[in-house]
A protein has these predicted regions:
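Residue-level marker of positions within ordered structural domains that often coincide
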Residues: 13, 45, 152
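Alpha/propeptide regions of enzymes that mature by internal proteolysis
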Residues: 32, 123-157
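Positively charged n-region of N-terminal signal peptides that target proteins for export
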Residues: 1-6
């Protein structure tokens, strides 16, 4: 082996071992088959795996929006049944899921990029946390057109 190779191997090992770049974010993807069917997927890039589990919410499940101050926000009931992965005991914080109409929604972590409305007395009653947005979308919308039509009914507060 030429003398440079052991040196490069040592540098590479030290670089990988000493440089710590904790991943903190998520990546999503959608694959569309020739027949038009879609398969979605995502990563959860956190230092520790979240305590997540599968949840199913039937039509009529009641939810209450969470605001930064701890006051209750918008109250809503599921118009559509949906299932997904949650990180909360009550299942209201959905990481991603799909409703009975086939609409898929997911929450992604973009620290330093995502901006949310400030809570005010005027918007608190329609408020919910960023982590509840996918829950609200899947509970209330059958397709993307409905999401666009209804999104102003809520205030995502952060």
């Amino acid at each position: 082996m030429p003398p440079i190779r052991p040196f490069l191997a040592i540098v590479l090992i030290l670089t990988c071992g000493l440089v710590d770049h904790p991943a903190c974010g998520c990546t999503g993807t959608a694959l569309v088959a020739k027949d038009g069917s879609v398969v979605v997927g995502r990563t959860l890039e956190f230092g520790m795996p979240p305590d997540s589990h599968l949840i199913v919410h039937p039509v009529g499940t009641a939810f209450i929006g969470q605001t930064p101050s701890g006051e209750s926000g918008i109250a809503f009931s599921a118009q559509y049944g949906f299932a997904g992965i949650t990180v909360s005991d009550d299942g209201s914080l959905l990481l991603d899921g799909t409703n009975e109409k086939g609409l898929n929604a997911a929450v992604f972590y973009f620290p330093g990029y995502a901006k949310f409305a400030e809570a005010t007395p005027e918007n608190r009653k329609r408020g919910l946390s960023p982590m509840q947005l996918s829950t609200w979308i899947l509970a209330n919308c059958a397709n993307l057109a409905e999401v666009k039509q209804k999104i102003d009914q809520v205030a995502v507060l952060g």
